[in-house]
Amino acid sequence: MNTQDVIDIFKQADAILEGHFILTSGRHSATYMQKAKVFMHAHLTEKLCRGLAEKIKKSVEEKIDYVVGPAIGGLIPSYETSRHLGIPSLWVERVNGRFELRRFEIKKGARVVIVEDIVTTGLSIRETVEALVTAGANVLASACILDRSGGKVDVGVPLISLAEYEIASYASDAVPAELAELPAIKPGSRNI
């Protein structure tokens, strides 16, 4: 599966939105990849996560004990990717604003791969790495369906992307005038 295949799946689900969006990262963009519209279709989600699992198998040489997803956005892709890898799926969730592995215990040194939906700044993955290291895990890599940075983001561990698709985004004090004229919509899941 290549980048165009991923974009075609998003198009098939009418999941590429145009307008003025405030992303989960806080950055502004004229394009929003509404993965919820993809994830509501099991057959499309299965295709993406099978492709991601295949890339993980090719990229990670060590045995993986768990796939871990950051709630909320990483829950569905981490679960479906773990199904294709044949290993358990866990998740971290926010407690007082910080990710914690609160519903599970893992053995010290457990080898994990983080799976996220879409990466823009990489903050959720970096926070997930921190939570997992605190819990005693060995984070081998992270993976995402779509890297909006076009491969430029640093998440602190190797990042395996099913697709790299650079989409312009702007700090709140650098939004172009034509974008600022449109009403901003915040469809993301941070602070839910």
From Swiss-Prot:
Record has Membrane as a keyword: no
EC numbers for this chain: 2.4.2.10
Signal peptide location: none
Catalytic activity of the protein: orotidine 5'-phosphate + diphosphate = orotate + 5-phospho-alpha-D-ribose 1-diphosphate
Residues the record lists as binding 5-phospho-alpha-D-ribose 1-diphosphate: 116-124
Cofactor: Mg(2+)
Binding site for orotate: 120, 148
Pathway where this protein functions: Pyrimidine metabolism; UMP biosynthesis via de novo pathway; UMP from orotate: step 1/2
InterPro entries, A to Z: OPRT, Orotate_PRibTrfase_bac, PRibTrfase_dom, PRTase-like
Family affiliation: Belongs to the purine/pyrimidine phosphoribosyltransferase family. PyrE subfamily.
Assembly and binders: Homodimer.
Identification of the protein by name: Orotate phosphoribosyltransferase
Gene: pyrE
